[in-house]
Amino acid sequence: MAQTQSPLQWLATTLIRGYQVFISPILGPRCRFNPTCSHYAIEAIKVHGTAKGCWFALKRILKCHPLHPGGSDPVPPKNDRCNK
């Protein structure tokens, strides 16, 4: 059974997918992480909801710069108490 999305989750994921389809191909691959920041944002919103997922995505995007080594950075699980 598919999980239903709230209207805010739908809006946020649609905006991110729009970025993936229309803007990202023009800019080319720039993300230092696996999964990419946009995929991370969609997964974080699905797992944690809109507010907390967007917060995780913002923190991740702020780490995505040339001085950070990047690498693997999965979305923390929902029941993880360290992600407050």
Swiss-Prot record:
Signal sequence interval, chain numbering: none
Matching SMART domains: Haemolytic
Disulfide bonds: none
Major site of localization recorded for this protein: membrane
Protein origin, superkingdom: Bacteria
Pfam families cross-referenced by the UniProt entry: YidD
GO cellular component: plasma membrane
Membrane topology qualifier: Peripheral membrane protein
Location(s) in or outside the cell: Cell inner membrane
InterPro entries linked: Membr_insert_effic_factor_YidD
Keywords (A to Z) from UniProt: Cell inner membrane, Cell membrane, Membrane
Protein role: Could be involved in insertion of integral membrane proteins into the membrane.
Alphabetical list of HAMAP family matching this protein: UPF0161_YidD
Family: Belongs to the UPF0161 family.
PANTHER family xref list: MEMBRANE PROTEIN INSERTION EFFICIENCY FACTOR-RELATED (PTHR33383:SF1)
The protein, known as: Putative membrane protein insertion efficiency factor
Classification of source organism: Bacteria, Pseudomonadati, Pseudomonadota, Gammaproteobacteria, Alteromonadales
